[in-house]
A protein has these predicted regions:
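C-terminal core of ALDH-fold dehydrogenases
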Residues: 323-430
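A glycine- and small/hydrophobic-rich beta-loop-beta segment
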Residues: 262, 270-346
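Conserved small-residue-rich beta-alpha loop and adjacent elements
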Residues: 109-174
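Conserved NAD(P)+-binding/catalytic subdomain of aldehyde/semialdehyde dehydrogenases
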Residues: 180-267
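Short internal beta-strands
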Residues: 155-164, 268-274, 279
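N-terminal Rossmann-like NAD(P)+-binding subdomain of aldehyde/semialdehyde dehydrogenases
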Residues: 1-125
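Flexible, glycine/charged-enriched surface loops at secondary-structure junctions
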Residues: 104-109, 229, 266-271, 291-302, ...
């Protein structure tokens, strides 16, 4: 059973703090192994990647067969049902339309002194996308990562996906084609991250790597950071639902289980001011668990990390929700706008009873790559801006240099940087 908390209980704060502090993911100590793999890939390039792929994925490759070819994309198209392809296309189009609105504008202006300032936005030239492999890999994640990159103007989107025993989900290939992925390689693990970061004879390096992966992939991303950029260190999925008593408990239970079925370490939580609804939701969760194909996974998640929190009123839930800073926040109340105004920390917010979080996973248009493990307190979900760089622009003419130069010289001398001061003074004949 999920943990049950009542805000009116004397030990509520201690138990709530323990809920926040609970560690949901056991990190394997893989840094040493990953460091060895990365060094090997950096030294031996293609051959190291091929050797590790044979060892871990049981797939013999050559430099010529690292890339997925057009014949395989064509076969994947034939293997995917028309209605599924149409759904992927709808999702792609909605993601593209929403992310087009995120594109920033260049800014140039001249201030009162006549100094010209501004900012210029340019796309990262090459981005790598890691997609977990096997038949359980998610085509929606391909769209969520690759489409914003292409909207940003990235010239070269390179996708890597492990194919254990040669198996790859055809939906992933179709999604890659729809999203505009430029290159796709059948490699995974830390060795794929190394190939993207350092490059090989077959795979030119990229400048940033995005996408989720296991402990080895996460460690590899951490270790190559600085050589390349990375997106975020994502953990298990989570949802928090703020609900009033007028909700259908079966709807809420379905939303909770939609997160719980992801992973035994996923977390599904609900806050309500109605104890009777809390009871009904718990009962509905138990009923629905018996019918789910991934019921065993969802049951473990609900048992170990689920939470039902009864608050004095929904306004009192807001400070608690902001402390949780959930990846996904559903506001399932009659009038959600006042509560929405008080939300400071959440990866994404789903407003009203008719907006289940799952719509955001697939076809809403907003991005489902979101901060987890309370990192929504200081970070945002994936967007077009993650694939762009802002460069400052400054121009001073002779008059502006005469006006500003003496102050620059004074500050440079105060910092003991004589060459800095001379750089300005020499232009002013000082």
């Amino acid at each position: 059973m999920a943990i049950r908390l009542h805000q009116s209980d004397a030990d509520f704060e201690a138990r709530f703090a323990a809920l926040l502090a609970a560690k949901r993911e056991v990190s394997e100590d893989v840094d040493s192994t990953v460091r060895t793999i990365l060094a090997d890939v950096r030294a031996r390039g293609d051959q190291a990647v091929i050797d590790y792929t044979a060892r871990f994925d049981r797939l013999p490759l050559t430099p010529e067969t690292l890339a997925v070819g057009e014949a395989e994309f064509a076969a994947a198209e034939l293997a995917v049902e028309d209605k599924t392809r149409a759904a992927l296309t709808l999702a792609r189009d909605r993601i593209r339309a929403h992310h087009e609105r995120q594109k920033p504008q260049d800014d140039r202006y001249t201030d009162a002194l006549g100094v010209e300032l501004g900012s210029r936005w340019t796309a990262i030239e090459a981005v790598g996308l890691y997609v977990p492999g096997g038949t359980a890999s998610y085509p929606s994640s391909v769209l969520m990562n690759a489409v914003p990159a292409k909207v940003a103007g990235v010239d070269r989107v390179v996708m890597v996906v492990p194919t254990p025993d040669g198996v790859v989900n055809p939906l992933v290939l179709v999604a890659a084609k729809l999203a505009g992925v430029d290159e796709l390689y059948r490699i995974g693990g830390a060795q794929a991250i190394g190939a993207l970061a350092y490059g090989t004879a077959t795979i030119p390096p990229v400048y940033k790597i995005v996408g989720p992966g296991n402990a080895y992939v996460a460690a590899a991303k951490r270790q190559v950071f600085g050589t390349v950029g990375i997106d975020m260190m994502a953990g298990p999925s989570e949802v928090l639902i703020l609900a009033d008593g007028a909700n259908d408990p079966d709807w809420l239970a379905a939303d909770l289980l939609a997160q719980a079925e992801h992973d035994t370490a996923a977390q599904a939580m609900i806050m309500t001011d109605d104890a009777a609804l809390a009871d009904a939701v718990e009962a509905a969760v138990e009923r629905q668990l018996k019918t789910l194909p991934r019921g065993e996974t969802a049951a473990a998640s609900w048992r170990d990390f689920g939470a039902v929190i009864v608050v004095d009123d929904l306004e009192a839930a807001l400070p608690l929700a902001n402390r949780i800073a959930p990846e996904h926040l559903e506001i399932a109340v009659a009038d959600p706008e006042p509560l929405l105004a008080g939300v400071r920390n959440a990866g994404a917010i789903f407003i009203g009873r008719s907006t289940p979080e799952v719509i955001g996973d697939y076809v809403g248009g907003s991005n489902h790559v979101l901060p987890t493990a309370r990192s929504a307190r200081f970070s945002s979900g994936l967007s077009v801006l993650d694939f762009m760089k802002r460069t400052s622009i400054l121009r001073t003419g002779p008059e502006q240099l005469r006006a500003l130069g003496p102050a620059a010289i004074t500050l440079a001398e105060a910092e003991g940087l004589g060459a800095h001061a001379r750089s300005v003074a020499i232009r002013l004949n000082l």
